């Protein structure tokens, strides 16, 4: 074996230098409500992402505190991080829903500040904001009428879906709490059952994490 130590410069380097945490520190403050409504497998976090991936580079779990101002400190925000988000990730650290995002990462004394204000990060609220509002409501209640008289707009969708009998599939509920497999919403999004109803809804949501999110919401009791 070659003795590679013979040609070093003789100085002893402190090992701690190579172990010091890389990058900046984020301090996030705000009132963040609804964390406890998420089931196992999901985490409400502040996270750093780069442009290339939906997987978080660095994360810090946010404690479940209702109606109280909290501050969360996340260290190790490297230069690879281009956005910081208040979001929900799955077990693989993949972004499922983002509630707030910040790409101005100006640091003062190596500290980035993020004030999120008051945010509802509840599971159903996330589905409403990021799925129903963006994908479903333009046909279901966004205008003066709603397709199939089904309103999926904010404040109306929960009543319209949960424990409501389907008008299209006899004997089934639109959402049966505790059983996605027996819910028309699940079947509608994951199969072509609705292709004979005038519109194939399975084209609407192709993101696997979002389909899983809706199933997990139903299977965990379909709470509001």
Predicted regions and their residues:
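Aromatic- and Gly/Pro-enriched helix-to-coil junctions and flexible linker segments
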Residues: 1-72, 77-224
